[in-house]
Each structure stands twice: as C-alpha cells, then as structure tokens.
Amino acid sequence: SLKLGQKAQIQNITPKSIACIYARSNSAVSDPFFSQIAKAIEQEAFKSNYFIRHSFTAMDIANPDIARQLSQFPVDGIVILGRYEKQLLRFFTQNYKNVIYTGLNPIGDQYDQVVCDGSDISYNALSYLVELGHTKIGYIGEQNNEVRFSGYKEALTKLGLPFLQKNTANVHLSADGGYKGANILMHNKADISAIFCANDTTAIGVIHALKEQNLRIPEDISVISVDDIETAQYLSPMLTTIHIPLE
C-alpha cells in the first residue's frame, strides 16, 4: 500500500526578471554580436530561475514615454550591452539597484562590468597583418572614446608604423557606416594595403564598397575585423575576424 507522509510543502517561486538594453543599436536585431550575447545571457539566467523580460534600445530609452514606463517595470536587474551615453547609465543607476555592463570599452571601477580588452584585440589584429607583410594599415569605425581606435594607434606605435589620419574613417559601427568609411578612404587616396574594421558588421559594408571598385580581397587589399559573428563565415571571401568568447 502507498503510505503518505507529511503534507508536501508547495512553494510558489516567482521567477526573477532581467532587462537587456542594446545601448549602441537602434534595433536589437540589427546588432548580431550583442544579439548573440543576449542569447547567452538568457540561457545562463534561465539556469538560475531568471528570465529576460524586456529588451530595449538606446533609442527607446530616449523616448520619455518609454523611459517612464521602463522605470516602472519590476525587473530585478539591467544588462547594458555595448557602449552607452552617460545619461543612459545615469537613468538606470537611478532606477535600478542591479546594473551590469558588457562590451569592449571599460567604464568606471564603481560599476559591475564584463569587458573584453579592446586594446589587446586591436594589437592582435595589427600584429597579424604585419606578419602577413602589411605596413600601411587603415582603420574604419568609431573614434571618439573608442578603445579599439586608441588601441589601433597604440599598436601602430608599438609596431613601429606611422599613424596617418587620412588612413582612418570615423563612422558608425554598421554595414552602412563601413560602406561610407571605405569610400572615405578611397576618396582620401589612403595609402594602405590593409584595413582594420572595428567590428564585423562594419567590415561587411567595407567589403561591399571595395568590391564595387573592383578591388580583390585579399589580393589587392586585406580586411580584418572583430567579433566573429556567424554571418562572417558566409561572406565571399570569408572574413578574417578575431573571435570574442561570448559564453
């Protein structure tokens, strides 16, 4: 016979929630790198009974109505994906107790953060190009307060190579930005044999612009970038990119 023990204690455990903020994107789905990070966060959070309840972009937060609604959402933590404006961080630290940042640009020590060193990435990229025989290397990507750009300049110095502003293009990290950046370098008659792109999405636009000018990659000019997004392996030729562990 079945013997029943003491009445089972049934607990209703309320799952905890997290919001992801795509700080440098107008659309969450437009940033494949941080979309991959968000997916990894969701998988790890689930193991601890947390759920990604909301996803917003910096543009959403700039809307006062959405920002007001967000401040009223009962989430237990905020994860900021990518570089942000100061007012964005101020908004979250004022409204939420648990805020963590992840990206390539370190922020103040007073904040919790998971950072992959952008300076080391830049040095590794340029060192690889130098090993291939390149001594004239351009840069396409954001420049203001961007550790990959400062790392690019530092790497040139360490490798004994000159820095020329005309060999760089300050553009938004997007395929459109990369396309514009490549055309800027060609218009400036940049003296380069290789281009370091700040991320893969930018490199996609760069490659498109170079192909329009009948430049062969890597025969005429080499391109290297950062992130190792899934799309990179389907480009022709396949994009040379530095892997960043997302797990």
Regions found by a protein language model. Give the residues of each.
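Hydrophobic alpha-helical segments within soluble ligand-binding/sensing domains
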Residues: V114-Y139, S150, E154, A175-I184, ...
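Flexible loop/turn connectors
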Residues: N183-E247
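Periplasmic-binding protein-like
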Residues: A19, V75-G82, G138-G141, T168, ...
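Hydrophobic/aromatic beta-strand patches that form the interior of the parallel beta-sheet core
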Residues: V79, I100, D112-V114, G138, ...
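Short beta->alpha junction loops
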Residues: R53-I61, N167-D176
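Alpha-helical recognition/docking segments in bacterial nutrient-uptake
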Residues: I13-S127, E131, H187, D191
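Short, solvent-exposed amphipathic alpha-helices that sit
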Residues: P32-K47, I121-A125, N144-P162, G177, ...
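N-terminal helix-turn-helix DNA-binding module of bacterial transcription factors
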Residues: S1-T14
